[in-house]
Amino acid sequence: LLQLVKKRLKEQKGMTLIELLAVIVILGIISAIAIPSILGLIDNSKKDAHVANARQMINSAKLAVTGDSSLQPPDDKTPVYVTLKYLQDKGYIETVKDPDGKGYSAGDGSAGTSKPESGSYVMISSTSGKLSYSVYLTNGTRSIKDASGNPVPEDQLSRDNVR
């Protein structure tokens, strides 16, 4: 009996067409499940990188305020806006790498009480002398902003704000 089984195994040349089709179908099902999951992970990683860049921008603005008192809001009702280009030009931050590969819109290099018309910026506001920071970071396709299109406060930064 053992010799008969060995003989049959030696005579078997390969897999049948049905067996090959079954393997291909199984691999197709596995890839159909796995690919969307992997793409979702990649997108979430990019969103997390945008959030990290926004935090880096806020930290740079904090350094700028410490070094330049003219960047502090004049009163509780008037915020100060500091563009990404201003932070880069003054050496508070290196050029920020956009995970989407497009490059961030850096703005016009201004800092003051006028809201920038375009580009990325940090908004510095004061409440009873306590400074708070909000960030708007855009690359033309995706931006860090709230549902109304306004800058996101520092304590609310998350991947949900990447729109």
Predicted segments, located by residue:
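Short, surface-exposed interaction loops/tails
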Residues: 114-163
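Aliphatic-rich helix starts adjacent to a transmembrane/signal segment
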Residues: 12, 39-59
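N-terminal leader/signal peptides at the extreme start of proteins
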Residues: 1-15
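N-terminal single-pass transmembrane signal-anchor helix
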Residues: 13-39
